[in-house]
């Protein structure tokens, strides 16, 4: 099984930006969590991070032809307004889970709406970095790979 984990804008700044919201652990720590989970479960996890909308869309489209079985995506702020990322996700007929480290529903009003979630299989919010691991567990339980 191959899972693509896409992280959008500013996720590379984990541990630097707004620690009270996103925690003190940094992006390399998140990558190590994902790597450990992949080894434990005997699956392949491919990670991708970009601050650019077009690069994220390109990577989603690449998943169509590179044997990706599922996508976990944290679109960052693009969650709330990127219909282009939404359309790219909708075009790939594999499980997709949207993850947010913070509980976006307890934050500013503009964060309460996700334009990308309706084209995803599910959404996990507010559980910190653990949300990524829960998304992996959910995908594994779907028996797709």
UniProtKB/Swiss-Prot annotation:
One of its GO terms (molecular function) is 3-dehydroquinate dehydratase activity. The keyword Lyase applies. It catalyses: 3-dehydroquinate = 3-dehydroshikimate + H2O. Keywords: Amino-acid biosynthesis, Aromatic amino acid biosynthesis, Lyase. One of its GO terms (biological process) is quinate catabolic process. The record marks 17 as: Transition state stabilizer. It comes from the Bacteria. The active site is at residues 22, 100. It is an enzyme of class 4 (lyase). Gene3D superfamilies: Dehydroquinase, class II. Its EC number is 4.2.1.10. Substrate binds at residues 74, 80, 87, 101-102, 111. Disulfide bonds: none annotated. InterPro entries: DHquinase_II, DHquinase_II_CS, DHquinase_II_sf. Catalyzes a trans-dehydration via an enolate intermediate. Belongs to the type-II 3-dehydroquinase family. Homododecamer. This is 3-dehydroquinate dehydratase. It comes from Lachnoclostridium phytofermentans (strain ATCC 700394 / DSM 18823 / ISDg) (Clostridium phytofermentans).
